[in-house]
Each structure stands twice: as C-alpha cells, then as structure tokens.
Amino acid sequence: MALLPILSYPDPRLRMIATPVKEVTAEIKTLITDMIETMYDAEGIGLAASQVDHHIQLIVMDLSEDKDSPRVFINPKVTPLVEEKQPYEEGCLSVPDVYDKVERPNKVRIEAIDQNGNAIDEEVEGLLAVCIQHEIDHLNGVIFVDYLSRLKQTRARDKVRKVLKIREKQGEQVAEKEPQPANS
C-alpha cells in the first residue's frame, strides 16, 4: 500500500479524459487499495483516478462516519433521475481549502462494475449522488470550480497556490526539525 500524490488545480493533467478500464487486473486492484488509503489519509470522501494521475475510469468513495465502507466504481455511468437540481457545498482534494455551492441533480442512477467485476446498478440520492457526479466529472476533465463564476475560479486558483506554498513551507520546517543522522 502506498500514498499517492494528489494533483492540484490548475494542473493541466486534471483536464485529461479518462479511458475505460478493459479488465480489472492485479495492478488495478493495487491502485484501488492505494487510492482508498490516499483518500483516507487526505480526509476525503471521494477520489478519482485522474486526481492521482491515472487517467482511467475509476473512482473510490466512502461516506461512512467510521471510514470503513469504501465503494469502488469502475467505468461509471450516471443518469439523472430528476430534472430539478439542488445546491450542495462541495470541496475537492485537488482544490484544497476551497468550498462552494454547486447545483446538481439530487437523485441519479449509477451503473458501473466493482473491483471484483460485479455489476452495480443503483438509484442513489443526496450526498452519495452528489459525490458520484463530482468524481465522474474528474474522469471527464471537469473540476467543481468550473461550475463557478470566473471571479470565483480566479480566487480558487489563488487560494490553492497559497495553501500549497504554506504546506511546502511546513514540510520544509518539519524536515529541518528532524534529527540528522550522526556521522560515524
């Protein structure tokens, strides 16, 4: 198991269109495990393979309180079941510390396969429906800030840059404080 680096907005790789998974191989299963571990470590509820620079149609999510019920959707297809859209406040691991309302259908049908090749065909609503649509957007090169005004997109980009600089400095400070090995 390994933590994977998460791409940050506005990295152009986030705009790449994911290709379908032809077969659930051992490598795909390892990627799934690593994505779930990465999602938990980053305290997220969903992660698309595109966000970790693997441009295949694969998403993982876990909306459970105890973070013990991960779901895997391979080659997901979503169909809205209602015309009306509802606003939900969304955030994204690729757009750290930025949250804003996005309107999406509250009820959808999700068709996919799981990590064992079993078919998934479910009607879902609420946060699960929103999360699935958000992650599928990533597979299509769409980021939630694309739904926002130009001004909010610019603010999001600036905020992400600041957050990443702060994290980089904190990482350097942590590295400086770690004990250095003694010369023998």
From Swiss-Prot:
Pfam families: Pep_deformylase. InterPro entries: Peptide_deformylase, Peptide_deformylase_sf. Disulfide bonds: none annotated. It catalyses: N-terminal N-formyl-L-methionyl-[peptide] + H2O = N-terminal L-methionyl-[peptide] + formate. The active site is at 135. Its EC number is 3.5.1.88. GO terms for biological process: co-translational protein modification; translation. Its cofactor is Fe(2+). Keywords: Hydrolase, Iron, Metal-binding, Protein biosynthesis. It is an enzyme of class 3 (hydrolase). Fe cation binds at residues 92, 134, 138. Binds 1 Fe(2+) ion. GO terms for molecular function: metal ion binding; peptide deformylase activity. Belongs to the polypeptide deformylase family. HAMAP family: Pep_deformylase. Removes the formyl group from the N-terminal Met of newly synthesized proteins. Requires at least a dipeptide for an efficient rate of reaction. N-terminal L-methionine is a prerequisite for activity but the enzyme has broad specificity at other positions. This is Peptide deformylase. It comes from Psychrobacter arcticus (strain DSM 17307 / VKM B-2377 / 273-4).
